[in-house]
């Protein structure tokens, strides 16, 4: 589970790489649209917080060659990210920073912070702390965007986030029904 810290799975027999690559495949269809929806100016500094396989980071790097793109994620995830970036020939365009989302410096200041599909992995207090840390990493006038799974108010629909929410809530106290998923703001 991608929760800001190394998974407790340990020597997982390839599970983490399979998970990260699966997330990359899932994000690939949206990445270019997201990069166009949040255009960058030359020289802008971007933080992809919990960037996983760097799918969105690569889309920004390709679409906006003058931008400085950073992916912050856990060391185990970034082992996979490095492989993916080499495969795409993008390792020189994306800077990688390893750490614990809640403890280690995020760097910055950044002009844009992208937070995609990580908030559901946190219990409410940690989720709020992470959002505050992201806000603190922004330059004056900086902006942030969050992409996340959401449940309707009854917390049972739509089906995909509903099925997803149960396991996440059991693991980290998060889940798609967490107040961090749609009910808080930077």
Spans of features found by a protein language model:
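Alpha-helical subdomain
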Residues: 45, 49-186
């Amino acid at each position: 589970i991608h929760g800001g810290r190394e998974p407790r799975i340990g020597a997982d027999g390839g599970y983490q790489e399979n998970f990260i690559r699966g997330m990359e495949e899932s994000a690939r269809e949206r990445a270019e649209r997201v990069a166009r929806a949040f255009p960058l100016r030359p020289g802008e500094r971007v933080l992809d917080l919990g960037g996983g396989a760097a799918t969105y980071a690569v889309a920004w790097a390709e679409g906006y060659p003058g931008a400085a793109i950073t992916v912050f994620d856990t060391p185990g995830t970034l082992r996979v990210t490095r492989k993916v970036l080499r495969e795409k020939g993008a390792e020189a365009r994306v800077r990688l920073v390893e750490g614990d989302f809640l403890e280690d410096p995020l760097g910055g200041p950044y002009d844009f912070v992208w937070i995609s599909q990580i908030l559901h992995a946190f219990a409410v207090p940690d989720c709020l702390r992470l959002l505050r840390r992201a806000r603190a990493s922004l330059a004056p006038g900086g902006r942030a965007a969050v992409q996340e799974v959401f449940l309707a108010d009854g917390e049972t629909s739509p089906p995909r986030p509903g099925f997803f929410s149960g396991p996440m809530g059991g693991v980290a106290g998060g889940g798609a029904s967490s107040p961090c998923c749609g009910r808080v703001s930077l």
